[in-house]
Amino acid sequence: MSENETRERQLRQEIIRVGQLMYARGLLCGFEGNLSARLDGERLLITPSGLHKGLMREEQLLVVDLDGRVLVAATDGARPLRPTSELPMHLEAYRRRPDVAAVVHAHPPITVALSIAGVPMDTPLLPEVIVLLGLIPTTAYAMSSSDEGAAAIRDLIAEHDALILQRHGTLTVGATLTEAFMRLETVEQNARIHFMLAQLAAERPLPAAEVAKLLRLRRAMGLERPGDAATFQAQWGVEPD
C-alpha cells in the first residue's frame, strides 16, 4: 500500500470514528451533519448525503475535487451515493482557509435552540472558550443545502475556527478531524453554560482586563486569528496590546 493509500485509509477511518462520536454525544441525529477532510491539495474525502453518520462505512465516503466534482464514487448497496448537500459550504471553507484540513458540520441542539431564541453566544464567559476559539459568531440565516450556506460563512470563516449557523447548527474547522470535532464540543458546552446562566439570570462576562490576558495566552499558543483584537475591542472594550 502506497503512502497516499495509507493516508486515505486512515482518514476514512477517522471520519467514521468522528461521525460515531458525534452521534453518541447527541450532536446530530438521523441524516444530519457532514464531515470532510483534505486528502491533498486537490482532493477532499467527504461524507455522502442520506446516510446516518453513526452507521456509515469507510467505503461509503466519496472523493471530490475542489470544484465539487466526484472523482471516486460510492454506493449504498445498489444505490449510488452523492456527496453531502452541504458540499458548497465545505468547499467555501477550504477556499477561504488554506490552513484547514478538516471541516465538520453538526446540529448540536442547545446551540441551535439558542440561535433560534436570539441568544448571543459571543459573550466572554468561559476562559477556555476565549483561548481556544475567541468569539463565536452567528451567521445570518441561510437556507440549508444551498449555495446560501456558502455565502453565509464566506467572510466569517476566514477569521474564526467555529461558527454558529442561524437555525441550522455549527461549522467547525481544524488541522485534523479530531480538532474540528473538539471545537464542536466546545461550542456546544459554551451554549450549555449560556443556557444555564439564562435560567439563573446570572450571566456575568469576564472583565475586559481578564479577557486581554486570555487573548495574550491565545496568541502565545499560536491560536490567534486575524481580527481577534479588533473584534474583542469593538464588542467588549478589550484594549489590544
What are these regions (language model features)?
Residues M1-D241:
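Glycine-rich flexible loops
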